[in-house]
Amino acid sequence: MKINKAEFVTSAVAPDHYPVHELPEVALAGRSNVGKSSFINKICQRKALARTSSKPGKTQTLNFFNINDEIMFVDVPGYGYAKVSKTEREKWGVMMEQYLTSQEALRGVVLLVDIRHDPTGDDVTMYNFLKHYEIPVIVVATKLDKIKKSQRQKHEAAVKRKLQFDPSDRFVAFSAETAEGKDEAWKAIYALITEGE
């Protein structure tokens, strides 16, 4: 996948701020610090398209990125960050739910989880939310380079078991360090935006 264009378009907190365009949208969701920004930067072959931060909970808006004039990535706020106030978390929740359930351009969601650990309660809640609303989902298990190759199957099985993963969904093991899983991620994303056309 050759990336000729990858640019930040705008940030939004409400539907009247969403950019007007005709591209299919793919949202990226996951726990704070799961590696969403690193995932976006790596698959788009850019060093700082999405800002990475050592401070969890940094993304507080819906951030729209135009990729090749073909896809609009939408980075949604990371969830599960304890140091953000309850009011702030609820505000994010409403913003995300509003976007995920009402945006007609949305073709699906890339849900990022950390392959090293069992998915959190928040991860399971998000996966169930997407299944409930019949929003197509790709589960991307990040930080693949942090576990031994001999342990991969065990970790993948644990993630799937905890999520009660639906085999009709796509699962990609991914490393932003080595780019392993990058091609598989693009294949899954393209399948998402071309299904039902």
From Swiss-Prot:
Q: Which residue spans adopt a coiled-coil conformation according to this UniProt entry? A: none
Q: Where does GTP bind?
A: 30-37, 57-61, 75-78, 142-145, 174-176
Q: Which SUPFAM superfamilies match?
A: P-loop containing nucleoside triphosphate hydrolases
- UniProt binding sites for Mg(2+): 37, 59
Indicate yes or no for the key word Magnesium: yes
Under the heading InterPro entries, the entry gives: G_ENGB_dom, GTP-bd, GTP-bd_ribosome_bio_YsxC, P-loop_NTPase, Small_GTP-bd
Q: Name one GO molecular function term.
A: GTP binding
Query: Which prosthetic group or cofactor does it need?
Result: Mg(2+)
- Pfam families in the record: MMR_HSR1 (PF01926)
Q: Which segment of the chain is annotated as a signal peptide?
A: none
Checking Gene3D superfamilies in the record gives: P-loop containing nucleotide triphosphate hydrolases (3.40.50.300)
GO annotations of cellular component type: cytosol
Q: Which keywords are on file for this protein?
A: Cell cycle, Cell division, GTP-binding, Magnesium, Metal-binding, Nucleotide-binding, Septation
Where would I find the EngB-type G domain in this sequence? 22-195
Q: Which PROSITE patterns match?
A: G_ENGB (PS51706)
Q: Which family does it belong to?
A: Belongs to the TRAFAC class TrmE-Era-EngA-EngB-Septin-like GTPase superfamily. EngB GTPase family.
Function comment: Necessary for normal cell division and for the maintenance of normal septation.
| Protein name (record) | Probable GTP-binding protein EngB
- Give the species: Exiguobacterium sp. (strain ATCC BAA-1283 / AT1b)
